[in-house]
Structure formats: structure tokens, C-alpha cells
């Protein structure tokens, strides 16, 4: 089965990349946020297994998020969750922070999304502002002030586009 792992900072485009990969396979992405799963000892692995099974039956590519949260849990839980991920019969995607440990056996596709520099962030701001029809003279001010990736830039521009009182200059952001 296909195993994709994407690591990077929040807002770096991990979700967008995994959604695109799932779409190329003719499927939708189903996000499983382990931060919302009850933390009762011995139950996390069973809960994850059940959710993965449901995703498989619905034809989704499950995307497990929040695995870094279980690193502080007891070692047994970590081992059990790793076993559930390794034995899942369908495709699976893992969304991890930069430099997180990967709880899969070799054979997965690893995509590390790098941190973007100010010029790249400026390009992302410019494209998102244009796409959402937001007039702003110089997006480089935003790129210098906010060290965020294209995912967050897109969400911010979508939100600003919905507002009736759009900021007219970078200082108002």
C-alpha cells in the first residue's frame, strides 16, 4: 500500500500537497486529527484503527495528523500506534512537523517541505492577493512581517476577501 509522509511547518502547504496527491489517485483526503482523540491509556491505537478502517471503506486516503503528540505518551501507546499504521491495508498519509520521527517501516515516500524565504513568501502573497482580488501595492511588507507558508497565506487572503472593510495598505494587516 502507498505510504506518503509530508513534513514541514504549519501553513507550509502540507495539507494542500496531500490533497493534490489524493486527487491524482481519484480519492479525497480524510484528515484524522489525533489531538481530538480521547487519551485513555490503551485506547488510542484501537480508536485509530477503527477510524482508518472507516476511511478505507469510504474510499478516502486517511491523513493522520498529530502523531507528534503521542511521543510524550507511554511507550506502549507509541508502539501500538506504530503497529496500527504499519499494518493498515490501504493507502495512508502522515502530516508531521519538521524533523519528526516517522513511525513507518522503510518504503514510504517522504516529502520535506522547506521553510520559504522572504522572496518566496512575497510571491505567495502576491499570487494569493491577486487570486482574491485584493489590491495591495507591495506584498513584500507582508512577507517580511509574517513568516508563514502558502497555506496560511491563502487562508488569510480568503478571509480578508470576505470582509467588507478590506485593509488598504500593509500597515493595516
What are these regions (language model features)?
Residues 1-173:
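ATP/nucleotide-binding catalytic cores
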